[in-house]
């Protein structure tokens, strides 16, 4: 991670950390870096979610892009993966999404996509950061005829919706409940599933600029769980603020998380011979029950660090077409370059329709082990060295020996905060509590600062 760019673009509290001034510079410098080798007038797509700060930051960002001669196609409110899809399919130089994903409304973010539809690599981000930190802005300042042109492009959203519908199957009146998190999916999810023939109940579809992710969406699926049971829906589908995640709810009101969604889609593709190298890419946070289910089905797995960017890197490097995270990021590389909650939802309902199985039946093939995660505040310098502390190494090894292969322990530093994360999985909650509490007691005694 750089000075400005985190694991998913530039984020911060809108108007305090992520200011219009910074957004202007990101537009100007980011646009230049991503289009400097273009032979024709560069074109950049810009989208945003429903946050009240979105239009403010969009105006500043667009001004920066126009100032270096870039033509800007303004997409309005739509999902992050829609920007990636449109960049790749319509030959744009780049795309920019203004969103802080599942964060509360006071935050916002700016993330870039290259002309291939993928998020930027570290080298491109470093180029932009170098320009941000330069003492003087020496980029070209074209005169009137060289300035960029601003184009409103609402057709982009319709094209994305049509594309997702084309990947699905008719749902013939299937009862579907949607929670669009008062976010980006509020402009598209209803239309997509109506076009597929679903009978819909929708919540989280009245954004006011301040209620994005507020007690709704993939991080707060409780309301959707109740709606599914009350409406008799076959499935509930909860997206986050920018609709790059999906958490599902089965007909009984039970949560189906990213691990189970990946398993269901992966098994379906594997049985059709369409799972590349018969492998799913996942992260170290995926549940042990997910791993055991894959082993039972003979499906391989590749494991990365936490973060969808690392999943995508591994998929691109090795040619895999399915990967994701427990949190609901699912990347279907045959269809899009990034996690796409609405695409995952369309595929999940297609599998239900084609197999004739309920979501609870499909999800029951994965037995999720109880999991507990505790964050311990430590000095930043110590979080990377924790595993070198003898007492910590010894207690982890002791707990792993006691598990005898029927559980899992993960101790890792936070990528963004002065925290050490201690996670354990085991067959019962009592065992999980024992393993985590025993390890955290030692960690706190040795290096904790609480």
Swiss-Prot record:
This enzyme's EC code(s): 5.4.2.10
Protein's recorded name: Phosphoglucosamine mutase
Modification after translation (UniProt): Activated by phosphorylation.
Reaction it catalyzes: alpha-D-glucosamine 1-phosphate = D-glucosamine 6-phosphate
Positions of modified residues (Phosphoserine): 101
Catalytic residues (UniProt): 101
Record keywords: Isomerase, Magnesium, Metal-binding, Phosphoprotein
Cofactor-binding details, from the entry: Binds 1 Mg(2+) ion per subunit.
Record Gene3D superfamilies: Alpha-D-Glucose-1,6-Bisphosphate, subunit A, domain 3, Alpha-D-phosphohexomutase, C-terminal domain
Domain of life: Bacteria
Enzyme class: isomerase
GO cellular component, one term: cytosol
Pfam families tied to this protein: PGM_PMM_I, PGM_PMM_II, PGM_PMM_III, PGM_PMM_IV
UniProt GO molecular function: magnesium ion binding; phosphoglucosamine mutase activity; phosphomannomutase activity
Requisite cofactors: Mg(2+)
Job of this protein: Catalyzes the conversion of glucosamine-6-phosphate to glucosamine-1-phosphate.
Chain sites annotated for binding Mg(2+): 101, 240, 242, 244
GO biological process: carbohydrate metabolic process; peptidoglycan biosynthetic process; UDP-N-acetylglucosamine biosynthetic process
HAMAP family recorded: GlmM_B
Stated family: Belongs to the phosphohexose mutase family.
Gene: glmM
């Amino acid at each position: 991670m750089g000075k400005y760019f985190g694991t998913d673009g530039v984020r911060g509290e809108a108007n305090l950390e992520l200011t219009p001034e910074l957004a202007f510079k990101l537009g100007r410098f980011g646009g230049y870096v991503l289009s400097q080798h273009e032979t024709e007038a560069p074109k950049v797509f810009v989208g945003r979610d429903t946050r009240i700060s979105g239009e403010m930051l969009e105006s500043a960002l667009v001004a920066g892009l126009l100032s270096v001669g870039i033509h800007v196609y303004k997409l309005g409110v739509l999902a992050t993966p829609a920007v990636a899809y449109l960049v790749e399919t319509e030959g744009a130089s780049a795309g920019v999404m203004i969103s802080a994903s599942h964060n509360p409304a006071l935050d916002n973010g700016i993330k870039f996509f290259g002309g291939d539809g993928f998020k930027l690599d570290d080298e491109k981000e470093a180029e932009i950061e170098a320009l941000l930190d330069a003492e003087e802005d020496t980029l070209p300042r074209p005169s009137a005829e060289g300035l960029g042109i601003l184009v409103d492009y609402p057709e982009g959203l319709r094209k994305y919706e049509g594309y997702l519908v084309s990947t699905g199957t008719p749902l013939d009146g299937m009862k579907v409940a949607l929670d669009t998190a008062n976010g980006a999916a509020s402009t598209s999810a209803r239309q997509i599933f109506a076009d597929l023939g679903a009978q819909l109940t929708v919540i989280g579809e009245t954004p006011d600029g301040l209620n994005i992710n507020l007690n709704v969406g993939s991080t707060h699926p409780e309301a959707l769980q109740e709606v599914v049971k009350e409406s008799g829906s076959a499935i509930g589908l909860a997206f986050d603020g920018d609709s790059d995640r999906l958490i599902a709810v089965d007909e009984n009101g039970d949560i189906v998380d990213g691990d189970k969604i990946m398993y269901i889609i992966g098994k379906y593709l594997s049985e059709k011979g369409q799972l590349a190298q018969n492998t799913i890419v996942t992260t170290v946070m995926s549940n042990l029950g997910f791993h055991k289910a894959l082993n039972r089905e003979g499906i391989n797995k590749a494991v990365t660090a936490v973060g969808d960017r690392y999943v995508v890197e591994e998929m691109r490097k090795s040619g895999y077409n399915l990967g994701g995270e427990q949190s609901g990021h699912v990347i279907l590389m045959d269809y899009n370059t990034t996690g796409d909650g609405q695409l995952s939802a369309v595929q999940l309902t297609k599998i239900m329709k084609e197999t004739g199985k309920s979501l609870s039946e499909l999800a029951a093939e994965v037995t999720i082990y109880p999991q507990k995660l505790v964050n311990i505040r430590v000095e930043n310098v110590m979080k990377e060295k924790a595993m070198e502390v003898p007492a910590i190494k010894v207690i982890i090894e002791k707990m792993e020996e006691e598990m005898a292969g029927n559980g899992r322990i993960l101790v890792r530093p936070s990528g963004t905060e002065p925290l050490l994360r201690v996670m354990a999985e085991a067959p019962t909650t009592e065992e999980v509590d024992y393993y985590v509490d025993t390890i955290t007691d030692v960690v706190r005694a040795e290096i904790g600062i609480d």
